[in-house]
């Protein structure tokens, strides 16, 4: 099959705002420096829903969504040297070419090698490997995991432990790695730190896990859905508060609770007003607030400059700061050695035909992560 077109099932998003449609598609063989992967499991993330809603300015249709997946290499194109058929892998939406100025700089993980074409839903050569009913179907985030087979650039693949359960470690392709890395890489919080985590979904829980691993003394969870508090405490939150229970702004509440403010705060929602509250909840002189949530296009953040002049820092993070190709295998190893949790994030398992139900569960707030077996 290596040099042949594969016919398989995929969940196609034909247009914005409509449910995904399970279709038979054709997946072309990998070209030079590309890898064709049989996807075994994928999760559904808020980013997929954001694009499907039509609000994403980079969203293009028709497209195969999905970026939290894991699978087995089916075949490789010419020039691929580090991967072979049969390898167990996680596709990566942030690649690591190892050669661009971003990859060569230890301060960032934002490889730009294929950014332009990836943003257009195309492979690095400017074309697609997917067709359905005679129409070209676009790629998504360089991964397109809502398909039995996908084709990705070889710099967008992490080779992982073949013993890892793919219906669990697929989550390391986005949300868990993002939150965990925000704490241990971006914030680099010290043991004994006091932290506040705004938004207790999957990413927020991963931040809590990272804070706990790093030795935080207090981890305060903040969410308007109190049903999320029990699970947050299981992950390591020492206390949880609901902003709706107070008559004053939540930053004032946190400043009072923590004798002047937290050492580190994390915004895991994508709400610019919450981003401001998270910054202003930080301690004068040294507090650091990390923006993890992705706000809608065109949104702007605001605060009084005095907040920054008096020693607070605003930072952002993407994929938790992990240089992807080299870091994801290590994260899988940390999971296998029980240093980090993954299983506990999975609240629902569905068949491929039920993929639209995964979006419904997410919008209802009833799931952390739903894993779809492909």
Swiss-Prot record:
Q: Name one GO cellular component term.
A: extracellular exosome
Q: Which GO terms describe its molecular function?
A: alcohol dehydrogenase (NAD+) activity; electron transfer activity; fatty acid binding; formaldehyde dehydrogenase (NAD+) activity; identical protein binding; S-(hydroxymethyl)glutathione dehydrogenase (NAD+) activity; S-(hydroxymethyl)glutathione dehydrogenase (NADP+) activity; S-(hydroxymethyl)glutathione dehydrogenase [NAD(P)+] activity
Q: Where does Zn(2+) 1 bind?
A: 45, 67, 174
Reported cofactor(s): Zn(2+)
- Co-factor remark: Binds 2 Zn(2+) ions per subunit.
Keyword Lyase part of the UniProt annotation: no
Q: Which InterPro entries match?
A: ADH-like_C (IPR013149), ADH-like_N (IPR013154), ADH_3 (IPR014183), ADH_Zn_CS (IPR002328), GroES-like_sf (IPR011032), NAD(P)-bd_dom_sf (IPR036291)
The UniProt record's further free-text remark is: There are 7 different ADH's isozymes in human: three belongs to class-I: alpha, beta, and gamma, one to class-II: pi, one to class-III: chi, one to class-IV: ADH7 and one to class-V: ADH6.
Disease the record associates with this protein: AMED syndrome, digenic: A form of bone marrow failure syndrome, a heterogeneous group of life-threatening disorders characterized by hematopoietic defects in association with a range of variable extra-hematopoietic manifestations. AMEDS is an autosomal recessive, digenic form characterized by childhood onset of bone marrow failure resulting in aplastic anemia, in association with global developmental delay, intellectual disability, and poor overall growth with short stature.
| Name listed for the protein in its UniProt record | Alcohol dehydrogenase class-3
Name of the gene: ADH5
């Amino acid at each position: 099959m290596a040099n042949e077109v594969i016919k398989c099932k995929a969940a196609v998003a034909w247009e914005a705002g409509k449910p995904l449609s399970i279709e038979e598609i054709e997946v072309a063989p990998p070209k030079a420096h590309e890898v064709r992967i049989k996807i075994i499991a994928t999760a559904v993330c808020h980013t997929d829903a954001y694009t499907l809603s039509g609000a994403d300015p980079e969203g293009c249709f028709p497209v195969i969504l999905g970026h939290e997946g894991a699978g087995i290499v089916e075949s490789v194109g010419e020039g691929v040297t580090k991967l072979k058929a049969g390898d167990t892998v996680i596709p990566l939406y942030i690649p690591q070419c190892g050669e661009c100025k971003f990859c060569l700089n230890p301060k960032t993980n934002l490889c730009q090698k294929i950014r332009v074409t990836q943003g257009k839903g195309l492979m690095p050569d400017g074309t697609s490997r997917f067709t359905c009913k005679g129409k070209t179907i676009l790629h998504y985030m360089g991964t397109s995991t809502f398909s039995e087979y996908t084709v990705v650039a070889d710099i967008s693949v992490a080779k992982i432990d073949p013993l890892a359960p793919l219906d669990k470690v697929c989550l390391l392709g986005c949300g868990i790695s993002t939150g965990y890395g925000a704490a241990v890489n971006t914030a680099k919080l010290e043991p004994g730190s006091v932290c506040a985590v705004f938004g207790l979904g999957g990413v927020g829980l991963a931040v809590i896990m990272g804070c706990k691993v790093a030795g935080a003394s207090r981890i305060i969870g903040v969410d308007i859905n109190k049903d999320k508090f029990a699970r947050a405490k299981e992950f390591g939150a020492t206390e949880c508060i609901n902003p709706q229970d107070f008559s004053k702004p939540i930053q004032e509440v946190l400043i009072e609770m923590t004798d002047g403010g937290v050492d580190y705060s994390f915004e895991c929602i994508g709400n610019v007003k919450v981003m401001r509250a998270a910054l202003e909840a930080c301690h004068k002189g040294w507090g650091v607030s990390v923006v993890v949530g992705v706000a809608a296009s065109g949104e702007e953040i605001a605060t009084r400059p005095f907040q920054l002049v008096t020693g607070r820092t605003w930072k952002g993070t993407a994929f938790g700061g992990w240089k992807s190709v080299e870091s994801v295998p290590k994260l899988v190893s940390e999971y296998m050695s029980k240093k980090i949790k993954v299983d506990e994030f999975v609240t629902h398992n569905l068949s491929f035909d039920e993929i639209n139900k995964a979006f419904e569960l997410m919008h209802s707030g009833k799931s952390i992560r739903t894993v779809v077996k492909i």
